Amino acid sequence: MKNVIDPFISLSYWPSAGGFGSNTNILETNIINSSVVLSVLIYFGKGVLSNLLDNRKQKILETIRNSEELCKGAIDQLEKARACLRNVEMIADEIQVNGNSQIEREKEDLLNTASDNLEQLEDPKNETIYSEQQRAFDQIRQQVSRQALRRAIGTLNSRLNTELHLRTIDHNIGLLRTMMNTND
């Protein structure tokens, strides 16, 4: 155990550094040792560093490939979506055209039906007007006939006297006798 502790004890006898400064003695600065260590680090570190850089490069290239594949997939999906959109737009246009033509047909049918209904309503109305006109004409004729009959009766009553009345009766009796004689 003594052998293990001896190097540490010997460290306690070394003089401590006086601080930072530049040492101009080449042998004390250990430039050769530093350059050897640096050369070894460069020689072995170069391989490690190049391996790290190659791994990083591979990861970046793989990420770029994956991104390009995802981009191609997205472009394919976009094209499919655009094609689907075009189909949907064509179908929507057809539906709109068909809908507009259907609306026009139904509008024309509705107008024709309304026109037919008006004609059907006009016929009874015209018949009613005609029958009302006929009834009015008949009433006017009856009133005119009654007035003419009243005037005629009034005129006859004012002009007829008893003598004319007796002569008319005699004349009518004579006509009846001749009619009876001709029938026998």
Swiss-Prot record:
Keyword S-adenosyl-L-methionine: no
Further details from the record: In plastids the F-type ATPase is also known as CF(1)CF(0).
CDD domains tied to this protein: ATP-synt_Fo_b
Family the entry assigns: Belongs to the ATPase B chain family.
Molecular-function GO terms, alphabetical: ATP binding; proton-transporting ATP synthase activity, rotational mechanism
Localization per Swiss-Prot or TrEMBL: Plastid, Chloroplast thylakoid membrane
Residue spans crossing the bilayer: 31-49
Keyword set, alphabetical order: ATP synthesis, ATP-binding, CF(0), Chloroplast, Hydrogen ion transport, Ion transport, Membrane, Nucleotide-binding, Plastid, Thylakoid, Transmembrane, Transmembrane helix, Transport
Function comment: F(1)F(0) ATP synthase produces ATP from ADP in the presence of a proton or sodium gradient. F-type ATPases consist of two structural domains, F(1) containing the extramembraneous catalytic core and F(0) containing the membrane proton channel, linked together by a central stalk and a peripheral stalk. During catalysis, ATP synthesis in the catalytic domain of F(1) is coupled via a rotary mechanism of the central stalk subunits to proton translocation.
Keyword ATP-binding: yes
Protein name as annotated: ATP synthase subunit b, chloroplastic
Membrane topology: Single-pass membrane protein
Protein source organism: Pinus thunbergii
Subunit architecture: F-type ATPases have 2 components, F(1) - the catalytic core - and F(0) - the membrane proton channel. F(1) has five subunits: alpha(3), beta(3), gamma(1), delta(1), epsilon(1). F(0) has four main subunits: a(1), b(1), b'(1) and c(10-14). The alpha and beta chains form an alternating ring which encloses part of the gamma chain. F(1) is attached to F(0) by a central stalk formed by the gamma and epsilon chains, while a peripheral stalk is formed by the delta, b and b' chains.
InterPro entries for the chain: ATP_synth_b/b'su_bac/chlpt
A GO term from the CC aspect: chloroplast thylakoid membrane
